[in-house]
Every structure is written in C-alpha cells, then in structure tokens.
C-alpha cells in the first residue's frame, strides 16, 4: 500500500505495478521481507522510533530483515552512520537531533541493507537550504555506489544538482 501511494498508483486502474521484478499487485506476504531488503525508504517526516536511540532504531531494522549476528549488526550500523557523518549521535534519542540530523539518520537507515533502490519522499522538504544541499550531495554519492534513487520533491532548483533522469 505504501508503494502504491508513493508511486501514485490506484488499485484497479493499474494492470501491473512492478518493482525489482516483483509485481506489487500479486506479491505474496512471505516475499515482502526480501523486497524490503532491496528497498530503502526515506520518509519526509523521518519515521524514527521515538522511544529508541539511533542505534536501537537501526538494530530493529536489521533484526527485522534477518541480521542474526550482533557483531555484524554493530559493524553495519557504525559503517552507515560514519557514511552520513552521524556516528557521534549513535546513542542519541530522535528528539535530541535537529531536523537535518534526523534526515541523515533516516538516510543511513535506508541504506542499512545496501538496497538497489531508495524511494525518498521530499527528503529536503523540512530542511534549511544548506542542510538540504548536504542531503542532496549525500544522495548523489549514494547513486555513485550503484543505488537508484527515486525522489519526490517540490524543490525544483535542487533537481539541477542531482544526476540522472528527471520527470517533471
């Protein structure tokens, strides 16, 4: 359902809705965890778990997607937080972070499982221009690693800084 909304699909009006080789109209419940591993989602309002630290937010995602080994989880959490410059916030609660910091944490969460595609809903919508520019640079770097980024935005000038195909 979330993907239908994000991709502006209306049930009944779309013959086929395929992502990463899976038709969303007929996907089986047991196939969804595998799809989630291949997708990263960045929500406009971050969707961090407010009762958990950054580390615990990430542990929750990794456990839910099948990461059994604690050492592997800890290593991956540190890797992605270093990548977005947020390792010093690992034990902070979401309410202790600024909007830009929460967005970088949300991006780190989206790349935890090395997804093939990231869907970003207004990733710069609630941010000041400088922080927004930093977020766009970060997403641009992620695309250089082979991950596709599908982004919705009202910030048209920002799109000029982003590589790839742009639908307006």
Locate predicted features.
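Helix-to-loop junction immediately C-terminal to a conserved catalytic motif
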Residues: 7-8
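Conserved ABC transporter NBD signature motif
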Residues: 15-23
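Short coil-to-helix segment of the ABC ATPase nucleotide-binding domain corresponding to the Q-loop/switch region
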Residues: 52-60
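Conserved ABC ATPase signature
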Residues: 93-97, 101-103
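Conserved catalytic motifs of ABC-family nucleotide-binding domains
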Residues: 114
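Catalytic Walker B motif of ABC-type/P-loop ATPase nucleotide-binding domains
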Residues: 118-121
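Helix N-cap at the start of a conserved alpha-helix in ABC-type nucleotide-binding domains
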Residues: 129-131
